[in-house]
Every structure is written in C-alpha cells, then in structure tokens.
Amino acid sequence: MIIPMRCFTCGRPLAQYWEEFRSRVEGGEDPRKVLDELGVKRYCCRKTLLAHVPAIYEVRKFKRVL
C-alpha cells in the first residue's frame, strides 16, 4: 500500500503513524482523539493523514502496457 511518507506541506515524517492511525480509526475510535494521542499537532499533517485514500487497490486493476 502506498502510504503518506511525509507531510506534503511541512515535510514532517508521517509514515510511522499510519498503521496505528488506520487500525484505531477502523476500530471505531474518533480520528481527532487518535491524532492527538499520536502527537500530530499541525493541521497540515492532520489533513494529510485524514485525507489519505489507499488508491493502490484501484490502480492494480489495470494491466501494465509497455
């Protein structure tokens, strides 16, 4: 899966938060609370994690053409 490695705005590394964030939100926790507990304070970093859509599942449906 392609995950956000860094914040697109400020450049802060975010990859270490992705798995825990995703699993806790899918488990029913409030994303705001999860981000606060992970220590993600900047709104640009929060936006990057909240808005990420795992598009790899859509992309891999297509065959590679050379």
UniProtKB/Swiss-Prot annotation:
It catalyses: RNA(n) + a ribonucleoside 5'-triphosphate = RNA(n+1) + diphosphate. Gene3D superfamilies: Homeodomain-like. It is found in: Cytoplasm. GO terms for molecular function: DNA binding; DNA-directed RNA polymerase activity; zinc ion binding. One of its GO terms (cellular component) is DNA-directed RNA polymerase complex. Its EC number is 2.7.7.6. Part of the RNA polymerase complex. Belongs to the archaeal Rpo10/eukaryotic RPB10 RNA polymerase subunit family. DNA-dependent RNA polymerase (RNAP) catalyzes the transcription of DNA into RNA using the four ribonucleoside triphosphates as substrates. This is DNA-directed RNA polymerase subunit Rpo10. It comes from Hyperthermus butylicus (strain DSM 5456 / JCM 9403 / PLM1-5).
